[in-house]
Amino acid sequence: MATVTPRTLSGFMELLPAPQQQMERMMEILRTTYSRYGFTPLDTPAIEASEVLLAKGGGETEKQIYRFQKGDADLSLRFDLTVPLAKYVALHYNDLAFPFRRYQIGKVYRGERAQRGRFREFYQADIDIIGDGKLDITNEAEIPSIIYQTFTSLGLTRFQIRVNNRKILNGFYAMLGLTEQSGDIMRTVDKLDKIGADKVRTCLTEDVGLTAEQADEIMRFISITGSNRQVLDALAGYQGRHELFDQGLEELNTVTRYLSAFGVPEENFAVDLTIARGLDYYTGTVYETTLLDHPEIGSVCSGGRYDNLAAYYTERQLPGVGISIGLTRLFYVLGEQGLLNPQLPTAPADVLILPMTQDLTPAIRLATRLRSAGVRTQLYTEQKKFKAKMNYADKLGVPYVVFLGDDEITAGLVACKDMTSGEQTKLSFEDTLSRITQGLSQRNQGKVILGK
């Protein structure tokens, strides 16, 4: 029979067992953190009707989407988790309690060009809060505070959540008489980190059609820097010239004040007028998060406030605020930079039992007792030589191997080897269990990420 050469498609990540354990550990920290803030887990279909996903219109989304026909059905793979959320809330409105707080960790699909650190299938980790008619400004401060707690729990320390408000930007552009061009301006400014200030200015004049004076005024505005207080004080100098600007500045002052109340240190968040977010549906506070020691990575977490996202599915006003972590990309770049903690265990089991007798009943009973005590235990039942069994234990990376032969069974003892130190003991079950649990608690110390 002819065989097919196994391969993984370009742009799709497939991990070996050890890094998969690291990825799972990251996801578990996210789930634990989000649950601590009262978010409920949600899962939505990977496949939706194309008209649902593309309700807003085509453009770049339609170029990147995986779309196919199945019989008469026009179907597409989801390209993010936000649009399915909008559909979900509109569909199940009568069964939900508002504000509706959900988190979702799931795969999304985009048919863009595969390149280093960019994937066509990747995990996103989203949190969103959806209101019914209104949504208090406090939520716009709580969302980035959750990201601070999440990244800190992962082990990151040198990161910065950059905060802005779209109303400030729209109000400022209105002052310049550029209301109609505001969307194009924000999409251009959003490229600042990628193409630099000179190219942004050129794009503003050549592509957007601004005058040199208008482009210079915008570049001066987005270049306002300093401490959060200094930036907010500088913005206060523009007050009174446009109502939308004043509203945005009031919201930004409130968000920064509440961020401090939520316990986010000022070194971890900054008012940054270059943050615009290219997506049109953002209407208020916007966020981007970067790793200070690795600016080349770009934003690893972004989001913001939106007021009309569900308008394509319902007449109800369902404002929301949310943020998304590109989990696959973050995991990839952390691995590339050597920032994933190699000391944390990645073995699928804590104990591997190697029976030394033909009758496996005692080994099965021992495995059952260890599992009942909460110890992840694997029973090796293959009839192979001792060396092959130990090679298997080494390859798995299990911290403890238990041998159970006639002598141990007769004496009511357990022979246990610490695979790190090489020390081997022969103790009662209770003493062996105590030794294993103490050793595991020491091994599980530390964060997933090596503190940068």
Residue ranges with predicted function:
Residues 1-20, 69, 179-182:
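Auxiliary tRNA-acceptor-end handling modules of aminoacyl-tRNA synthetases
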Residues 19-37, 48-51, 72, 84-94, ...:
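Positively charged, Gly/Ser-enriched RNA/tRNA-binding surfaces
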Residues 42, 46-76:
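Polyanion/phosphate-binding surface patch
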